[in-house]
Every structure is written in C-alpha cells, then in structure tokens.
Amino acid sequence: MGGLSIWHWLIVLLIVALVFGTKKLRNIGNDLGSAVKGFKDGMKDGDAPADAQQLPRSGTVDVNAKEATRSDSNKA
C-alpha cells in the first residue's frame, strides 16, 4: 500500500507528457544528456597533467630563513 505500482508511474508519466508536451521533454532530455557529457569531459580534462608552468617546483624550502629574518628585525 505504501509503494507505487507501475500503473501509478504510467499515470504520472502520462500527466507530465500532457502538461509539458513530448517536444519539451525531448529537449530537456537532450540538455540533460549534453550537461552530463560536458561534466564527464571536464572530469577527464582535470585528470590530465598540468603544464610545466603550473607544476610546483621541486626543491627544498628553507623555512628557518624567514624566521631568522623576523628575529633580526625584532632585535633592532
């Protein structure tokens, strides 16, 4: 009694088709499909390696150098 049978879903689908029209529903389906395709393409592009300019430089960073500069300015 709590679940909807196939007949309930068919009636709902028929009402939606009458209200919006099949052409409008087809356009909505096409728009939704192209949006999903664009999202998947964007996710593929996000996995591609970045350009050499955008990659972080590999090397060591001297964290103590900044703190040493601060200590010198506080003494003066």
UniProtKB/Swiss-Prot annotation:
<feature type="compositionally biased region" description="Basic and acidic residues">
    <location>
        <begin position="64"/>
        <end position="76"/>
    </location>
</feature>
<dbReference type="InterPro" id="IPR003369">
    <property type="entry name" value="TatA/B/E"/>
</dbReference>
<keyword id="KW-0472">Membrane</keyword>
<feature type="region of interest" description="Disordered">
    <location>
        <begin position="43"/>
        <end position="76"/>
    </location>
</feature>
<keyword id="KW-0813">Transport</keyword>
<feature type="transmembrane region" description="Helical">
    <location>
        <begin position="1"/>
        <end position="21"/>
    </location>
</feature>
<comment type="similarity">
    <text>Belongs to the TatA/E family.</text>
</comment>
<keyword id="KW-0812">Transmembrane</keyword>
<keyword id="KW-1133">Transmembrane helix</keyword>
<dbReference type="GO" id="GO:0033281">
    <property type="term" value="C:TAT protein transport complex"/>
</dbReference>
<dbReference type="GO" id="GO:0043953">
    <property type="term" value="P:protein transport by the Tat complex"/>
</dbReference>
<protein>
    <recommendedName>
        <fullName>Sec-independent protein translocase protein TatA</fullName>
    </recommendedName>
</protein>
<keyword id="KW-0811">Translocation</keyword>
<comment type="subunit">
    <text>The Tat system comprises two distinct complexes: a TatABC complex, containing multiple copies of TatA, TatB and TatC subunits, and a separate TatA complex, containing only TatA subunits. Substrates initially bind to the TatABC complex, which probably triggers association of the separate TatA complex to form the active translocon.</text>
</comment>
<dbReference type="InterPro" id="IPR006312">
    <property type="entry name" value="TatA/E"/>
</dbReference>
<dbReference type="GO" id="GO:0008320">
    <property type="term" value="F:protein transmembrane transporter activity"/>
</dbReference>
<keyword id="KW-0653">Protein transport</keyword>
<keyword id="KW-1003">Cell membrane</keyword>
<comment type="function">
    <text>Part of the twin-arginine translocation (Tat) system that transports large folded proteins containing a characteristic twin-arginine motif in their signal peptide across membranes. TatA could form the protein-conducting channel of the Tat system.</text>
</comment>
<dbReference type="Pfam" id="PF02416">
    <property type="entry name" value="TatA_B_E"/>
</dbReference>
<keyword id="KW-0997">Cell inner membrane</keyword>
